[in-house]
């Protein structure tokens, strides 16, 4: 199995569940010429219906629960969810907020965690590669 066996570009959809935007800036940094992940076929898309990977930043407030579930359901199978940043795992700076429901993995299943506040772009790229491998394994299981 190689990363070349995925026949098209890997499409990533990003949703901010309520972060401070630090993680969002690092996701955008991955797309800049310094890292240029598009040369490897990793593309940010504007619709969850086109995505292979869902990248979620921030903790989940009450207002985002139904939207996050709806976005997750719109992504076609096989799909992988990345939790980017410490806020979505434990609350981070928003830990004691009255409006938080909890970490992302209590709302939707998370496959790959990217810790950090904010995580480095290299860590995000490494997580996307792990997600890519999981997608390939899921695609192989569907074929066989």
Task: Say what each PLM segment does.
Residues 1-144:
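Iron-sulfur-associated redox domains of electron-transfer enzymes in respiratory
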């Amino acid at each position: 199995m190689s990363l070349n066996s995925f026949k098209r570009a890997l499409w990533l959809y990003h949703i901010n569940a309520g972060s401070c935007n630090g993680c969002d800036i690092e996701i955008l940094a991955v797309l800049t010429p310094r890292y240029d992940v598009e040369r490897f076929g990793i593309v940010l898309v504007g619709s969850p219906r086109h995505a292979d990977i869902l990248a979620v930043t921030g903790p989940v407030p009450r207002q985002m629960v139904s939207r996050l579930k709806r976005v997750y359901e719109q992504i076609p199978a096989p799909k992988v969810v990345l939790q980017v940043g410490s806020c979505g795992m434990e609350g981070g700076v928003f830990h004691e907020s009255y409006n938080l429901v909890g970490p992302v993995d209590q709302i939707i299943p998370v496959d790959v965690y990217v810790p950090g506040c904010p995580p480095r772009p290299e860590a995000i790229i490494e997580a996307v590669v792990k997600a890519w491998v999981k997608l390939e394994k899921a695609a192989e299981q569907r074929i066989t």
